[in-house]
Regions:
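DEDD superfamily 3′-5′ metal-dependent exonuclease/proofreading module
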Residues: 1-264
């Protein structure tokens, strides 16, 4: 039987505050949006940051780019689910079924710890991701190891101010084109969940392009490999995501990057 090649899953999560937990722990009252803003205000007064500890967050979107083991683009989409629990369950089931290589930007510090915390809330099994016994030195939880989970934030230095948008701007990649992370809370309470999914998809496309560039400068991709992967992404976006506002930006950026690579 032919051995199945490992997929690569470049992923990102978006979250808002868990107002139910905030009410229970902090005794705040009011509508969800007001409770969220008040909690952020209190957190800022205590720590000079509005970002609450991870247990106070809940997941509202998970999106992923899927490629083959060589980085050739297959698709980008949101992880389906009628509820937070179903969405997270589907994500961990995907990991259980395919054991993909994960790629993220700060996913070892934010996305995956958050998903595991919410799995605890809903009693969702994450056995493959949490398995540190079968291979002690090569598992999803290994630090400073890119074989099972390449966290580009970690790989590129993990320094203060290392933001995906800034790195993309420096590296001639699209970056954030419309929505920024601090707008997600307001968009959610304006019933703009699809806009959040679109933003999350654009983030994973940026991460995918940054990952390709990283693999290229490491010597793992030739110029032709790199250009081909970008071309496949552009073709997919134009055929399957024509209604997304980010398509023209990513296609143009991809075309320009291909020119730079092949004209060297």
């Amino acid at each position: 039987m032919k051995e199945r090649q490992q997929l690569i899953c470049i992923f990102d999560c978006e979250s808002i505050l868990d107002t139910e937990l905030i009410r229970r722990v902090w005794n705040l009252e009011g509508e969800d949006f007001e409770v969220s803003k008040e909690a952020m205000k209190k957190q800022f007064e205590e720590s000079a940051s509005e970002f609450l500890p991870l247990p106070f967050h809940k997941v509202i979107s998970i999106c992923a780019v899927i490629t083959d083991h060589f980085g050739k683009f297959i698709k980008v989409n949101k992880i389906e689910g009628e509820s937070e629990a179903e969405m997270i369950s589907n994500f961990f089931k995907f990991i259980d079924k395919f054991s993909p290589k994960l790629v993220s930007f700060n996913g070892k510090n934010y996305d995956m710890p958050l998903l595991v915390l919410r799995a605890l809330k809903y009693n969702i099994k994450a056995s493959t991701y949490l398995d540190t016994i079968s291979d002690k030195w090569n598992n999803y939880k290994s630090r400073f190891n890119e074989l099972k989970h390449c966290d580009l934030f970690e790989s590129l230095g993990a320094g203060r101010g290392m933001r995906l948008d800034t790195i993309c701007a420096m590296a001639n990649l699209p970056g954030k084109y419309d929505v920024h992370g601090d707008q997600v809370l307001e968009l959610f309470y304006q019933n703009e969940l699809e806009k959040i999914h679109e933003y999350c998809e654009s983030d994973v496309l940026n991460t995918f392009m940054l990952y390709l560039k990283y693999e290229f400068i490491k010597g793992n991709l030739t110029e032709e490999d790199y250009a081909n992967s970008l071309s496949l992404m552009s073709e997919y976006l134009q055929e399957h995501k024509a209604n997304r506002g980010y398509v023209d930006i990513f296609v143009h950026c991809s075309d320009e990057e291909i020119k730079r690579i092949l004209e060297k």
